[in-house]
Amino acid sequence: MSDAQQPSEFEPTSVADDFEAVDVFPSTEDMDLRPGADNCYKCTSCDTSCPVAEVDEDFPGPKFQGPEQWRLKRHEDVDIDDSILSCSNCMRCDDACPSSVPLSQMHNTARGEYVEEHMDKLSIEYLRNRMLSNYRTMASIGSKVPRLSNFVMGLGITSVLGEKIMGIPSERDVPEFATETFRQWWKKRGGSTVSNPDKQVAYFHGCYSNFNTVEVGKAMVRVFEEFGYEVLVPKQQCSGTPMFANGMLKDARREAEVNVRELGEAIDNGAEVIASCTSCSMALRQEYPELFDIEGIEELSEHTWEALEFLRVHEDMGQAIRESEVDPQAFAYHAPCHARNQGLDRQAVELFRELDGVTIEDVGDSCSGISGTYGWKSEKYETSMKIGAEMFEHMEHAEGDVGMTECPTCAMQMNHGTGYEIRHPLELLEEALV
């Protein structure tokens, strides 16, 4: 019988009859990511994209810390490697992976396990990381007497002691507290000047726009009101981003529970959630549903937007910008890694190139290096600056001598490496439209 002939008794079978789908990510709080590791076929795209691996030859990279470690844990009880603490949580590996392996989810879970099981809770490193992770708590105290806090934190001796005692690099300038927090301003203002039940947004301002860069929060409110939106400012906690990066998952869950509940009420009443910080929007959209099983968490993820993104989707921003004009100014724009992960990396450049009076240049796709609290650790400072070197160079060769970014810690790094003033896109949008 030739190869082309078929046996008369042959009966094809349906794959669907025998196939049973495997739920690799069961919906449980105790998530086992080991099956998901099998989607990795070791192409090393994640390692190539990793900014830490590029400058630190001792760092094994995201492939090892993610799928390879989970594969090992499938076969034997092995400890999480301590190199997980060198991951900056930039999440660029998520975007790089062609197989959609949940790398950052694996890293966050592994880091949480390492901190919980292996880190000495009385060590200076743990206490320092806990303090950095809970910036909102520290800022709540410092902002009660902002002028005194700024004076004390600006003293040279404070920087020296901070490095020697807590491991916070003395090279860094501690950001100043605003003399009035955003929420204090909001209360004094009497809330939104627009009443429109059909166009409501709930503003998730995050920690930094509340305590430090209050003008960003004010700009967000004024711009959205200009488009007829009623702005709500619900009760809220930290997004949890610095807690994820430091393995403080219990702290992050505590904050997430409040945010899901409070923002969920606004969503139930028809509002969309708006964040002015791309790391905050990333946390609410991606990290919350990946790491926690909280009622309403998926709804929050689905209804969260970055501010500029929301306006570009729901309003005719192109026409509004083309009809506006500002004084001549040139910007060097850096897209935060967490903006890239959400597909938002060029939106500010595309928008403001249409604004009369503005020259804006994208300074490339490199990481700033600071990665939230990462660059605020003495042992990571040099690595942070090596990662940021490419961005600094591109900024200095750009036409503009004012930087622009959506991320507050990227703004710190940009200013630290170049001395440039750094602005948020919402501030320029307010200048153009309000």
Language model features with spans:
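Cofactor-cradling patches in redox/metallo enzymes
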Residues: 200, 206-300, 306, 330, ...
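Short functional micro-motifs and their immediate structural scaffolds
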Residues: 48-51, 55, 98-102, 342, ...
